[in-house]
Amino acid sequence: MVREKVKVSTRTLQWRCVESRRDSKRLYYGRFILSPLMKGQADTIGIAMRRALLGEIEGTCITRAKSENIPHDYSNIVGIQESVHEILMNLNEIVLRSNLYGTRNALICVQGPGYITARDIILPPSVEIVDNTQHIATVTESIDLCIGLKIERNRGYSLKMSNNFEDRSYPIDAVFMPVQNANHSIHSYGNGNGKQEILFLEIWTNGSLTPKEALHEASRNLINLFIPFLHVEEETFHLENNQHQVTLPLFPFHNRLVNLRKKKKELAFQYIFIDQLELPPRIYNCLKKSNIHTLLDLLNNSQEDLIKIEHFHIEDVKKILDILEKK
């Protein structure tokens, strides 16, 4: 466990981790402070951060299991101590760590008798298990058991539908929430108009990421939500014919994209593939999945189009522009 004495700065706003510990493979704890804040700011930030930590961070879960030996999810398999329902519940609790996008397949294939744990799951390279000792089932007889698994990355909850069975595959309730709990508290100091606040933020995670990583991702997601309000090229929103529709102004770096198109010849763009741009792997994969293969494909999309791509962030657009301007 790491613990620091809290020293309050009276100058620049800063944050610091003052306590960090690992209680188990599936329980991490971190305590952070942000100071100095003006009166009222700590509560504003604390509420927003807590909601972002609990609802805006993606997690990876097993969402479906399939086996030819399972007639329905409340049946029993000969030679298996647990019911199918209990096995599905155990799979639901497996904690995974990954940066995958989309869906991946995994497999359990064992021969009894013996105990089946998370260690027996054959995973794709992009996924790893946080706690290999998590129990799945007990095989009491000399039988072969194979279970196919589907793994997804998402946020929030995914509740199974009882009638959503596909070819003897069974959906599993998934909780895509790496942060198990988050609390904030406020300490005030000073008098009168000089009164200031310290924000204390406590974060508990399931081990798939650290509290510090969770804080970083939640902060980034909050920034992405607020960026549309930071436009500088237009001061007001313009209502279209439909008064319920609002056209958002362009992003501040829109002119950079326009200037880039003017400087370079579009004829050459179609012969430059995004493979040549040395993009970060995540950005490259997002573009590929959206059928963007060449520089021409890329520049034919506006920045608004790009940020609509799944798992694509606003800062990724700026990063792409920075790379293109160097070419």
Swiss-Prot record:
In Gene Ontology terms, what is one molecular function of this protein? DNA-directed RNA polymerase activity
Q: Which Pfam families match?
A: RNA_pol_A_bac (PF01000), RNA_pol_A_CTD (PF03118), RNA_pol_L (PF01193)
Enzyme Commission code: 2.7.7.6
Name the major location: plastid
UniProt subcellular location: Plastid, Chloroplast
Alpha C-terminal domain (alpha-CTD): annotated segments: 267-327
UniProt keywords, alphabetically: Chloroplast, DNA-directed RNA polymerase, Nucleotidyltransferase, Plastid, Transcription, Transferase
Name one process (GO BP) from the record. DNA-templated transcription
Q: Where is this region: Alpha N-terminal domain (alpha-NTD)?
A: 1-233
| UniProt keyword Nucleotidyltransferase, yes or no | yes
Recorded catalytic activity of this chain's protein:
RNA(n) + a ribonucleoside 5'-triphosphate = RNA(n+1) + diphosphate
Q: How does it assemble?
A: In plastids the minimal PEP RNA polymerase catalytic core is composed of four subunits: alpha, beta, beta', and beta''. When a (nuclear-encoded) sigma factor is associated with the core the holoenzyme is formed, which can initiate transcription.
Q: Which family does it belong to?
A: Belongs to the RNA polymerase alpha chain family.
Q: What is known of its domains?
A: The N-terminal domain is essential for RNAP assembly and basal transcription, whereas the C-terminal domain is involved in interaction with transcriptional regulators and with upstream promoter elements.
**What is the purpose of this protein?**
DNA-dependent RNA polymerase catalyzes the transcription of DNA into RNA using the four ribonucleoside triphosphates as substrates.
Q: This chain belongs to which protein, by name?
A: DNA-directed RNA polymerase subunit alpha
